Amino acid sequence: MIENSSIWVVSDVDGTLMDHSYDLTPAKETIKILQKISIPVILCTSKTASEVKVIRNELNLTDPYIVENGAAIYGESLKKVNGKIILGKKYETLEEILNAISKEIDYKLIPLNNLTDQEATELTGLKGNSLTLMRDRHWSMPFLNPPSFLEERIKICCKKFKVDIFKGNRMSHLLSINSNKGKAINALKKYSNIQNIQIIGLGDSPNDLPLLLNSDIK
């Protein structure tokens, strides 16, 4: 649908499209209306591709989707690039960088995937298969929010290792400097080759700021 519309709705998921109890019901009617008038709804989230596939099925969405805070774009319609556009660093590389930052600041930054299932459930509210899907990361690394007094030192380290950190509602996210939600939107616009696309951006947390800054209506 993106090839046929110059208006795109690009929406965060947690706390925006769904409430903090993970309920999508309030958004379903609006999405149906947008689909009837051929306006694409592009999910743009910190969630994994595995998580978003479930949400897309529930909402009957077929448009491309942006995952892991803008580190990757997937979609069946992205045929010229075999269904994906990758902007981020591999998870294994980010893990090495997070460990290096931990040594530099003398404080252990703990990746989400290092938590036990019980600890991760307490943090996110997810369990069972939902928790498994959340752990299936390839291009970003969420980790527990560090103490605020370390934030400036961490920023200095980020410049050294050419990464960015975005603070979300529940945790922080380590990403390549080449990937965020705004850069992902621009990459998708470039791929579409449509002139003068108007972006309606929806988000609710600091990691949505690149999305909102690259939106025309927010």
Sequence positions of predicted segments:
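Receiver (REC) domain switch/active-site residues of two-component response regulators
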Residues: D63, D216-I217
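A short, Lys/Arg-enriched amphipathic alpha-helix followed by its capping loop at the start of a domain
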Residues: E3-V10, P26-V41, Y191-I197
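Residue-level marker for buried hydrophobic side chains located in beta-strands
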Residues: V9-S11, Y65-I66, G201
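Conserved acidic, metal-coordinating active-site core of Asp-based
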Residues: I101-I200, P206-N207, N214
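Active-site phosphate-binding/coordination module
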Residues: D23-N113
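Glycine-rich beta-strand-to-loop/alpha-helix junction loops that act as flexible
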Residues: N69, L202-D204, I217
